[in-house]
From Swiss-Prot:
This is Cell division coordinator CpoB. TPR repeats lie at residues 149-181, 185-218, 222-255. Residues 121-143 have a biased composition (Low complexity). One of its GO terms (biological process) is FtsZ-dependent cytokinesis. The lineage of its organism: Bacteria, Pseudomonadati, Pseudomonadota, Gammaproteobacteria, Pseudomonadales. Residues 58-94 form a coiled coil.
Length: 268
């Protein structure tokens, strides 16, 4: 009887242990360290553990936007640098062209056609015929050739000195004082050259245009028209350039200005 009680007692005590052993152990964090919700230090981070990743994404986007802005600004700077380089090159070419014209025999003229400068003129007529051709309609006031030449030479010397501001003023004053001078056509042309050297494209355009308008028979007309086309191109008036160049080629064949105009037409 006593033995039966012991067996029953052992069985009663072993049943909970057997049931506990049958319950499977599930590890939700198997294979991961640290466990979810905990930082690397072991401290619990809570549900906001994903916040640092979001902040890093925003920072990356901001940096990307800044990089894009810097790239655009760099492109603008490069364009401006190219424009400045082009303008410097054009100014240098204008000065060099002016020097060539001065040094190639384009000195102050003893007659209206001795100062052809660009080589675009044909054989020069005599001084009397040239002076008559330059006089606008209705003008018959006599001049003083010696005094006119003195004023003209003084203005031209300012070009040689590269004092373009004073040269422009001097040629303007000469044309106001001696509009019918035998040197007026030359003065009008060189006024255009001086204004171009100064970078005054509007003034250069007006001066070159007036050579053919006021002195249509003057030997400077082909050169002045060709230079006018160049100025209009610089000002962006491409619609006018082709017509002016065609006028030079058609009306003044055989001149160096016509040859240059033909070359430029082929590039348009």
């Amino acid at each position: 009887m006593r033995m039966c009680r012991r067996v029953v007692t052992v069985l009663a005590l072993s049943l909970p242990l057997a049931a506990w052993a049958e319950v499977p152990v599930v590890d939700d964090n198997a294979g991961s360290y640290p466990p979810a919700g905990y930082g690397t230090s072991g401290a619990y981070a809570g549900s906001g553990a994903s916040a640092p990743a979001s902040a890093q994404g925003q920072l990356f986007m901001q940096l990307q936007q800044m990089q894009d802005q810097l790239s655009r600004q760099q492109g603008i700077i490069e364009e401006l640098q190219n424009d400045v380089s082009r303008m410097k090159q054009e100014n240098l070419e204008r000065y060099q062209d002016l020097d060539r014209r001065i040094n190639s025999g384009a000195a102050p003229a003893a007659t209206p056609d001795n100062s052809s400068g660009g080589g675009a003129s044909n054989a020069a007529p005599d001084a009397a015929a040239g002076a008559a051709a330059q006089q606008p309609a209705g003008s018959s006031q006599p001049g003083d050739p010696a005094k006119e030449k003195l004023y003209y030479d003084a203005a031209f010397d300012l070009i040689k000195q590269k004092d373009f501001d004073k040269a422009s003023q001097a040629f303007n004053a000469f044309l106001r004082k001696y509009p019918n001078s035998q040197y007026a056509g030359n003065a009008q042309y060189w006024l255009g050259e001086v204004n171009l050297a100064k970078g005054d494209l509007q003034g250069a355009s007006q001066a070159f245009a007036q050579v053919s308008q006021k002195y249509p028979k003057h030997s400077k007309v082909p050169d002045s028209l060709y230079k006018l086309a160049d100025v209009e191109r610089r000002m962006g008036h491409t619609d006018k350039v082709k017509g002016i160049l065609q006028q030079v080629v058609t009306q003044y064949p055989g001149t160096s200005a016509a040859q240059l105009a033909q070359r430029d037409l082929q590039k348009l």
